[in-house]
Amino acid sequence: MYQIYVRSFADGNGDGTGDIAGMRSRLGYLRQLGVDAVWINPWYRSPLRDGGYDVADYREINDRFGTTAEAEAFIDDAAEHGIRVLVDLVPNHTSSDHVWFVESLASPAGSDARARYHFLDGRGPGGAEAPNDWQSVFGGSAWSRVADGQWYLHLFDESQPDVNWDHPDVADEFDAVMRFWLDRGAAGFRIDVAHALTKAPGYPDAGLDVNDGKGTLDAVPYLDRDDLHPIVRRWRRVLDEYDDRMMVAEAWVAAGRRPLYLRPDEYHQAFDFDLLAAPWDAKQFRGIIDDSLRAAEAVGSNSTWVLSNHDVVRHATRYGLPAGVEPALWLLDGPHDLLDAERGARRARAAALLTLALPGSVYVYQGDELGLPEAWELPLDVLDDPIWHDSDHSVKGRDGCRVPIPWEPTGPSLGFGKGGTWLPQPPEFAGLAAGAQETDPNSTLLLYRHAIAVRRERLRSGAGLDAGLVWLDVGADVVAFGQADSIRCVVNMGDEPVSLPDGVVLLASGPIAGDQLPPDTAVWLR
């Protein structure tokens, strides 16, 4: 599965912003890469205060990206290339520009229009204090006050009011939105903040002052609640009306809670973010892989591996930082000479071979296949992420992983489009452009293509990937495993070379010296 962040993938009309025309122009590239499907970040009508996750109309395409007719054509064109299309669904909140929220502001307290959201009276004299202590993921209170004195809930930016899933209109509307896109050929949905949706009755204080941005804490009264699962089962019934459709959950929950989202009548997949969040450490990687495979097997699902996405520092940069350095804080505070970019690139290539060898599904964020690093030097005056503003400039935000893709090594936008780019591309992107890598037999792009081709052949032959994983003892700092088709993956995560097991090298993430596997290097053996 290949993730497309529309604004930054390809610009078809030269206005500096990615669009559907640009996406259609790159379908041949995606087919050659070997992807089975693409997940499209929100392309709906939106003021783009949070990159499209503030949806004003779920049935209309943002006119900066194209039209609904173009979206339908993209889905059809992708199918002709053998590529299915998942669309992003944002059910926890709408944009403050959504017709429902506009109506709620024009309606009195206690009205049905306000009941579609979470409007409450405040505490303290004159209701001047927020209804409780809940915090926004982006920083500050999760409540904002409106002109008549009431407060509304927004777990994210104030422009993203949370909808009330206890109101029947909300469930009916999202059923209809799902059918709208399924009728137009969408293969399914990636569900945004799938661990949110419902809130504890009475809106009790959380009782803690915390904002980790991921919602992984236990007993938070607005995250990972058991009463959200009937909503998911209702969605699953909608999908089951159609042939061969799926949902994947973005649920930042503890590993022990993830299987609850993967029961046979709920999600088909849920992202395993534990590997994404793990340091470069063989013991931790082995434990995470074991736990994920075991949990997925218990509910008849499969593991869903991901190393980067549009919300986190790219792994080619994360892996180049010393252990214990928090990437999101390092972006702003540095010191930036801590980064070993070459080491990060080596580890990113090795991690690609590791995940593509594992049973389950693999999600690749656009640019991962080029080895793109985080654009960590973005000037502060170009930052667009609301996290930068809502955190009072204490967190730089996610713009660095959203910089437009370089397609060619030259030109004003490196082949992104005929004009400029909505975020500036760093100088090192030129050497990493897709066009520059096409002719380099040692490039990250060709490594991905070859690895995906081998993976597809293994799936086609029915060998290996569905079989149990067997760990191989190659050393404490090595992740090594094999499967039924005799392909073995060996990843040296230590600081010293290790001896390779016997076998023929099919793929290597870097140069191999005889029978020695260098640090930060992976191989596939037969």
Regions of interest found by a model, annotated:
Residues 1-502, 508-509, 513-526:
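Active-site and adjacent substrate-binding regions of carbohydrate-active enzymes
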